[in-house]
């Protein structure tokens, strides 16, 4: 399997399948996917003034407020992230907290819509 075939397979995966893939890669290689995202975001902060003219391509979805129906919000967190029940509950209870990082604008808006349907307040950065 070459690089292009791998990328094509990843493009055809659902968000849940991608979350499972990331978790499997983390376990297999003993790494954390969170570290490279933070490192990749750091150079943008020190970029020259010309950089802000570029359109942002990666967005973070941050759960700001849970709203009145915490159980439905936990279900959406599990659906979006692929987290287990306890991890999703902990994330919801520690809001404001990033739910998904480094996603496309379309995906971020879809995630935001899912949370707003269940009464949660979400911010896209």
Swiss-Prot record:
The keyword Ribosomal protein applies. GO terms for biological process: translation. InterPro entries: Ribosomal_bL12, Ribosomal_bL12_C, Ribosomal_bL12_C/ClpS-like, Ribosomal_bL12_oligo, Ribosomal_bL12_oligo_N_sf. Keywords: Ribonucleoprotein, Ribosomal protein. The keyword Ribosomal protein applies. GO terms for cellular component: cytosolic large ribosomal subunit. GO terms for molecular function: mRNA binding; structural constituent of ribosome. Belongs to the bacterial ribosomal protein bL12 family. Homodimer. Part of the ribosomal stalk of the 50S ribosomal subunit. Forms a multimeric L10(L12)X complex, where L10 forms an elongated spine to which 2 to 4 L12 dimers bind in a sequential fashion. Binds GTP-bound translation factors. PANTHER family: 39S RIBOSOMAL PROTEIN L12, LARGE RIBOSOMAL SUBUNIT PROTEIN BL12M. HAMAP family: Ribosomal_bL12. Forms part of the ribosomal stalk which helps the ribosome interact with GTP-bound translation factors. Is thus essential for accurate translation. This is Large ribosomal subunit protein bL12. The gene is rplL.
């Amino acid at each position: 399997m070459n690089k292009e075939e791998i990328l094509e397979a990843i493009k055809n995966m659902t968000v849940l399948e991608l979350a499972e893939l990331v978790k499997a890669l983390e376990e297999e290689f003993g790494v954390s996917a969170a570290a490279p995202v933070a490192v990749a975001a750091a150079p943008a902060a020190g970029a020259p003034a010309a950089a802000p003219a570029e359109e942002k391509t990666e967005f973070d979805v941050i759960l700001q407020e849970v709203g009145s129906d915490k159980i439905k919000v936990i279900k959406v967190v599990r659906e979006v992230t692929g987290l287990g029940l306890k991890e999703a509950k902990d994330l919801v209870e520690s809001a404001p907290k990033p739910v998904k990082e480094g996603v496309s604008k379309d995906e971020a808006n879809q995630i935001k819509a899912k949370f707003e349907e269940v009464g949660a307040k979400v911010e896209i950065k």
